[in-house]
Structure formats: C-alpha cells, structure tokens
C-alpha cells in the first residue's frame, strides 16, 4: 500500500476496541491497513470520513495463511505503527469446551499475534523506528475460572510485551501493552458469556479505552490499564492469593451468574 502519510496496521478492527483504535489512528494523521475475520465495510467508511486512506483485509489471523495475507497486503510499505488487537475469548468450564475452539483462541491470541509482530517488528527494527501496541488485559493478572484459556493467553501477552520492550529499548521501536477490563463490545456475545455476571453488567466505553491506549502508544509508555476501577483491580491482583482470585473470577464468569446479582 503506497501512502505519503504514516501507516498504521490494526488487527481486529471490524468493531469494538480495534475499530476505535483504527479511528484514533485515522484522526491523528495515519493511513491504515486493517484486518479482521469478517467484513469491515462500516469501519472503512468511518476511517475514510476522517480523511485517511485505508485498505481492508478479511483474514483469520489465527492461521499462518491469514498472517501471510495481511503481510502481503502491506507489501513493502513502511509500517510506523502496529496495533495488534485481534483476539478471541470463550466462556464455560475448560473440560466442557470444544478443544479445537480452545486451540483457535491460543492460535489467535498468541501464535498469530507473535507471528505478525515478528514479521513487522523486524522491519521496524531495521528502519530504526516504530510503535507496537498489543492489546492484553487485566484478565492476565488472575486465574480465569470459566475463562481459563483466555486469561492464560492474556497473561502470556502481558508478560511478552514487557520482554519485547526491553529487547528493543535501544532500537527506536517502542512496545506498549493496553490492558482493558470488561469493555462494551461483542466479545462476551462471541464468547457465549451473556449469561454471566461480567457479561451482563455495565462495561467500559471502547472509544475511551482506545483513546487511552493510543495515547500510551504515542507517548511510548510500557503499559496502561484503562479505567480507574481496573487500576484498582490490577493492583489488588498483585497482592491477592491465586486461590482467592480464582474464586472471585468464578463469581464473575460462571454460567448463570447474571441471574444472581
């Protein structure tokens, strides 16, 4: 993709936090390549309305083919910002879940994210500049009872981002981890969690989460927890026994808990 403006690549951009991150980029002087596993026609219209050029790719970033499809769409263009936001969740007990569905969560949240960062991160290091924003989660701070695999993937991402940031500290490439809490997106519907307390209660505005994450990326911060309540939860998680955190998570994510509050 040829562009005279800085180029941002945003994954998971069809809706929610990803869409709002793309709009932040468009409003702040970036042209975009966006990717999701479904149509992004509305996202394209909103991005263009902000004066940015955009190329949209439908790809499953939990597969090697999907990552290659996105890299191919970028071509030889210089990437100034990579916002690796694509991710999936799945509710209910681990042993009751379909294993292939679990595998796809790992492939999307970890393997595909790493593959894309590995490809684009190398070119950023070679060019001596770039910004990487990875969407982690405060879920990575606690054992995810009834979301065991999802929380595990986010624990990986939260840790990985700091390690990569340190490896790149003298290269001109910054790495930032955005750690939201429950946000008003399609996540809980797609994860089959609408019958849970966390799935049915009031959530954060994705536009505000994206604004906070974009600013942290542009400021070169290491991480940012979006929202005061989430900051308190994150701080408490660091001093609370894992057994207690697991029980607290059960009360939020166990099927049927939406009817108990």
Where is each model-derived feature located?
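Residue(s) in the substrate-gating loop at a strand-loop-helix junction
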Residues: 137
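Conserved glycine-rich Rossmann-like NAD(P)H-binding loop of the short-chain dehydrogenase/reductase
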Residues: 28-43
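Active-site helix of classical SDR
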Residues: 117, 153
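C-terminal helical subdomain
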Residues: 177, 197-234
């Amino acid at each position: 993709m040829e562009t005279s403006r800085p180029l941002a690549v945003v994954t998971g951009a069809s809706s929610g936090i990803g869409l709002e991150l793309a709009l932040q980029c468009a409003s702040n002087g970036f042209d975009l390549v966006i990717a999701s596993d479904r149509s992004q026609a509305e996202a394209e219209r909103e991005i263009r309305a902000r004066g940015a050029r955009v190329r949209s790719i439908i790809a499953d970033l939990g597969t090697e083919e999907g990552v290659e499809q996105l890299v191919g769409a970028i071509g030889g263009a210089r990437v100034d910002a990579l916002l690796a936001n694509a991710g999936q969740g799945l509710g209910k007990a681990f042993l009751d879940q379909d294993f292939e569905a679990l595998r796809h969560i790992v492939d999307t949240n970890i393997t595909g994210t790493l593959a894309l960062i590995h490809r684009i991160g190398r070119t950023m290091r070679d060019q001596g500049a770039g910004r990487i924003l990875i969407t982690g989660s405060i879920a990575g701070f606690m054992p995810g009872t009834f979301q065991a695999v999802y929380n595990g993937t986010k624990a990986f991402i939260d840790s990985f981002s700091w390690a990569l940031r340190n490896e790149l500290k003298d290269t001109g490439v910054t790495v930032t981890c955005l750690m939201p809490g429950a946000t008003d997106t399609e996540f809980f519907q797609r994860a089959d969690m609408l019958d849970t307390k966390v799935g049915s209660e009031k959530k954060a505005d994705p536009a505000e989460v994206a604004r906070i994450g974009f600013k942290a990326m542009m400021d070169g911060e290491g991480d940012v927890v979006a929202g005061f309540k989430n900051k308190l939860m994150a701080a408490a998680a660091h001093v609370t026994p894992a057994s207690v955190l697991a029980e607290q998570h059960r009360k939020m994510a166990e099927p049927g808990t939406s009817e108990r509050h």
